[in-house]
């Protein structure tokens, strides 16, 4: 069991249960506390109820897309590092997500090693 995310709460949102489970397991094995949701409204609830240290957010979600979640967080002035994860290779979507506050944009299928390394880097940047 790793510990690079001990004392960190990671919110993970994806509508694919297999992806959600694998990402959650990867963060837990590195010591994180995790909260999960399968849609955009669930993502907003997770963030509002307990301010996670980091949000891993799928773009294409039922009941409010990942982009709409980012817009809502921006409207509510809720700031936290967000990693957008998507199968959408469109450059405009990437630029839009980054413009709405996503700090990283990773394409599916995402390497769990790359995801964890990106999360670690963002959290270190947020702490300094």
List each language-model region with its residue ranges.
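Alpha4 helix (beta4-alpha4-beta5 surface) of REC/receiver domains from two-component response regulators
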Residues: 68, 89-104, 117
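Active-site beta3 strand of CheY-like receiver
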Residues: 50-56, 61
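Two-component/phosphorelay signaling modules centered on CheY-like receiver
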Residues: 17-35
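A Lys-centered signature of the CheY-like receiver
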Residues: 108
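The feature encodes the CheY-like receiver
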Residues: 20, 62, 90
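Acidic catalytic/metal-coordinating carboxylates
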Residues: 39-42, 65-68
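Non-catalytic signal-transmission and effector/linker regions of two-component phosphorelay proteins
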Residues: 1-11, 113-128
């Amino acid at each position: 069991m790793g510990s690079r995310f001990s004392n960190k709460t990671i919110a993970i949102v994806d509508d694919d249960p297999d992806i959600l489970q694998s990402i959650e397991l990867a963060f837990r094995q590195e010591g994180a506390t995790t909260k999960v949701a399968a849609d955009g409204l669930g993502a907003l609830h997770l963030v509002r109820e307990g301010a996670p240290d980091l949000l891993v957010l799928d773009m294409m979600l039922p009941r409010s897309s990942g982009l709409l979640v980012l817009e809502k967080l921006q409207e509510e002035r809720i700031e936290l590092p967000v990693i957008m994860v998507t199968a959408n290779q469109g450059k405009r979507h990437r630029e839009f997500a980054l413009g709405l506050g996503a700090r990283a944009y990773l394409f599916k299928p995402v390497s769990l090693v790359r995801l964890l390394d990106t999360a670690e880097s963002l959290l270190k940047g947020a702490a300094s």
